[in-house]
Amino acid sequence: MNGTYNTCGSSDLTWPPAIKLGFYAYLGVLLVLGLLLNSLALWVFCCRMQQWTETRIYMTNLAVADLCLLCTLPFVLHSLRDTSDTPLCQLSQGIYLTNRYMSISLVTAIAVDRYVAVRHPLRARGLRSPRQAAAVCAVLWVLVIGSLVARWLLGIQEGGFCFRSTRHNFNSMAFPLLGFYLPLAVVVFCSLKVVTALAQRPPTDVGQAEATRKAARMVWANLLVFVVCFLPLHVGLTVRLAVGWNACALLETIRRALYITSKLSDANCCLDAICYYYMAKEFQEASALAVAPSAKAHKSQDSLCVTLA
């Protein structure tokens, strides 16, 4: 299987005019809204916030990854008219894939950081620091970019938005599936542990109880965004791998499903930006509440709200 390419579905995907127009509108809205929200987020992170925290470093890198992916969307729009496998298309596809899986990796890092802060607040003082967060981000960038460059040098091509399936094989599926399902397991585990810890924490007053509820809601919201945006695409890739390479009629349907779910995953760029403010506020509050007395925690909350305003 490793050395056999699929011979089915060699023609480019064609869409009815109404559906193609819908793609144009959807991607156009994502591009404009995503650029505005992520640019604003970067401005706040870099110019308006006073202290570089672990969460701020992760979210700054996430905003950069989302902006890089958004910059490839004009090429996605162009691919609806021209699917030629040009060097520019392949470069754009590489940037697109790099930042998709970088976003997945950073969301996973944020989930782990959140887990350590809430479940192990005393140990977190030694495990968490801005320098360590920056090192984690640097390692993730190197790993994601390096793996994609290695696949390109080996001549293993993934469909991406230049969606031509004539060269998909087992190897081309291994990276995206491994690059999602392992992070998914980590994100689900960390999220459930954090929610459990928050639910078991006895509130000392109304303010602490409200902060805990907000933090728990944000965990569920982040997990929901991650699953809704990325799971359908990778389930489709899994199905494609499972059905084999000669079921031509079924593969044509899967190709269309993969294209649609790939565009759905792009919505993560906008949804991430909406979550930035709440992620910074609620989880720094939750971490403060975990290790500080009530009065001191309220003071920390008030100071943090002023900083983010």
From Swiss-Prot:
This is G-protein coupled receptor 35. Belongs to the G-protein coupled receptor 1 family. It is a multi-pass membrane protein. Changing S300A: About 50% loss of ARRB2 recruitment. Residues 1-24, 78-90, 157-174, 240-258 are extracellular. The modification Phosphothreonine is found at T307. One of its GO terms (biological process) is G protein-coupled receptor signaling pathway. Pfam families: 7tm_1.
